[in-house]
């Protein structure tokens, strides 16, 4: 994720310069500053070693992309920005942060491991609840019903759409989801407890529903947004299956392929 994002950012940045100058957009310096900050936050998420660092830069990414979403400063952009912040900040503060605190209380650490850290540290009966807090706390993964921020954010300038779809935002969300499934819960723990079975159904429903919605959208950006949500759900589904083959397939193949195609 980090390598692909840093590579695609080069082309996205070059395009954004031409777009901003060609359309004579206002506040270009502010735009470039927050654009660079967003990519930096995404890379910090990619290389985070613990949940605290992950959460901090997850929030930095949210706040740095808000001025980009609302760049046009019209009523539609402001409305989209309010929805963007309310869903992403609300979900992370209300659900993601308490979930991280729960992990810290249970394990005594915020470090992550390739085999997970919760096996033997948490009551199996509470594992689905903790997973649900993580899943719905990671609003950037855009699972239903917390997906509406992405179609709304398409009012942003085209370079921001590339940032949202390919370079940083949604990929940071689904990458965080995979990290939680593999490095916090662990594939073996999920398979043994069945804690992610409900997530399989949710991801499957999301990918089917949003694919159908995308077909009936005439606006190209709206169709792209719902198509992106569908593809993100494929990645989440692969992680929720709790097998090494599925996890490797979505992390090494589908995640990178979707980043490149959306760009």
Regions found by a protein language model. Name each.
Residues 8:
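Active-site-adjacent substrate/metal-binding segments within catalytic domains
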Residues 2-5:
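Predominantly extracellular/luminal regions of secreted and cell-surface proteins
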């Amino acid at each position: 994720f980090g390598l692909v994002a840093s590579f695609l950012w080069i082309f996205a940045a070059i395009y954004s310069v031409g777009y901003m100058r060609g359309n004579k957009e206002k506040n270009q310096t502010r735009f470039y500053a927050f654009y660079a900050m967003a990519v930096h936050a995404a890379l910090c998420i990619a290389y985070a070693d613990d949940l605290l660092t992950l959460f901090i830069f997850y929030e930095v990414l949210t706040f740095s992309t808000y001025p980009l979403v609302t760049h046009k400063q019209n009523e539609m952009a402001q409305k989209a920005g309010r929805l963007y912040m309310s869903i992403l900040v609300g979900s992370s503060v209300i659900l993601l942060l308490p979930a991280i605190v729960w992990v810290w209380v249970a394990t005594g650490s915020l470090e992550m491991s390739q085999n997970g850290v919760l096996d033997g540290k948490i009551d199996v009966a509470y594992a689905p609840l903790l997973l649900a807090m993580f899943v719905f706390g990671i609003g950037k993964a855009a699972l239903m019903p917390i997906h509406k921020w992405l179609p709304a954010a398409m009012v942003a300038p085209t370079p921001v759409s590339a940032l949202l779809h390919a370079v940083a935002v949604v990929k940071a969300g689904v990458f965080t989801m995979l990290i939680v499934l593999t490095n916090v819960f662990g594939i073996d723990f999920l398979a043994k407890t069945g804690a992610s079975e409900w997530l399989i159904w949710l991801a499957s429903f999301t990918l089917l529903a949003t694919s159908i919605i995308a077909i009936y959208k005439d606006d190209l950006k709206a169709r792209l947004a719902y198509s992106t949500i569908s593809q993100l759900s494929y990645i989440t589904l692969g992680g929720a299956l709790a097998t090494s083959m599925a996890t490797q397939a979505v992390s090494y193949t589908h995640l990178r392929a979707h980043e490149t195609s959306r760009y």
